[in-house]
């Protein structure tokens, strides 16, 4: 384990697998998350998904990110509860959140891990053509999970964020990803930290905002500023601000 040089939040740490192995989401992943918070109950720990677009920037080596911080997702409430047969000791619910999040809570971490694996297996195979969700196309898997584990009120908690990385001709960077009209803000992966409610924006925005600030304060037509057009990739003239 080491602390991140980026320090996106308090005590931002990265936990690496001692062996060089690629990112994967499975039963072992859930067990590792709970092993960590069993030793460090004051920390939160999560894993990026194991697929491109919905995963982190590094998929070639297994790692986790944690810290001593309460994210907006951790504080979000459950808006609908449900039960799963055979898991009476696990509280289940859908979190009130912009993404699809299943929250499992209980004192028996083995039960939570087993149910997490069951949900993962079910989601991997899930298809709903009405909303454009396909489990796989041409042998390529699209469904995975971004898991986040923590403790609350003496209980173990895991948030399972359902992800799908399918692309289309209209949305080549992902159907369930910021679309082209938002790419001037961010088109990079939406990873673990963003999923939990903390925006990690590209550093280029700092330069872009400085140019825009100068243009706005001086009442300049941004469509006449080449630097702005190249930075935000506008292909058509923009109306004066």
Each PLM stretch: what is its role?
Residues 219-220, 239:
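Accessory, solvent-exposed terminal regions and/or long lumenal/extracellular loops of proteins
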Residues 1, 60, 82-83:
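Conserved alpha/beta core surface patches that mediate binding of polyanionic ligands
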Residues 1-49, 70, 91, 95-218:
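Catalytic residues for metal-mediated phosphoryl-transfer on nucleic acids/nucleotides
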Residues 59-69:
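Histidine-centered catalytic micro-motifs
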Residues 67-88:
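Helical (often loop-to-helix) elements that flank the catalytic cores of nucleotide-handling enzymes
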Residues 222, 227-231:
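An amphipathic alpha-helical core segment
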Residues 232-241:
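Single conserved hydrophobic/aromatic residue that forms the stacking wall/gate
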Residues 51-59:
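Short, conserved secondary-structure transition motifs
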């Amino acid at each position: 384990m080491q602390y991140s040089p980026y320090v996106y939040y308090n005590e931002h740490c990265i936990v690496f697998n001692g062996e060089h192995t690629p990112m994967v989401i499975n039963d072992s992943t859930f067990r590792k998350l709970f092993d960590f918070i069993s030793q460090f109950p004051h920390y939160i720990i999560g894993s990026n998904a194991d697929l491109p677009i919905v995963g982190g920037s590094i998929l070639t080596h297994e790692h986790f990110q944690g810290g001593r911080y309460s994210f907006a997702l951790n504080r979000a409430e459950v808006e609908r509860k449900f039960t799963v047969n055979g898991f009476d000791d696990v509280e289940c619910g859908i979190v009130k959140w912009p993404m699809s999040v299943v929250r499992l809570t209980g004192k028996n971490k083995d039960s939570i891990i087993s149910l997490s694996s069951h949900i993962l297996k079910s989601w991997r195979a899930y298809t709903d053509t009405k909303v454009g969700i396909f489990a796989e196309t041409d042998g390529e898997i699209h469904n995975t999970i971004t898991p986040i584990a923590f403790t609350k009120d003496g209980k173990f908690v895991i948030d399972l964020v359902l992800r799908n990385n399918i692309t289309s001709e209209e949305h080549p960077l992902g159907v369930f990803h910021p679309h082209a009209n938002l790419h001037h803000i961010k088109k990079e992966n939406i990873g673990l930290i963003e999923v939990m409610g903390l925006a990690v924006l590209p550093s280029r925005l700092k330069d872009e905002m400085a140019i825009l600030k100068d243009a706005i304060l001086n009442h300049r037509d941004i469509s006449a500023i080449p630097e702005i057009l190249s930075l935000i990739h506008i292909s058509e003239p923009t109306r004066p601000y």
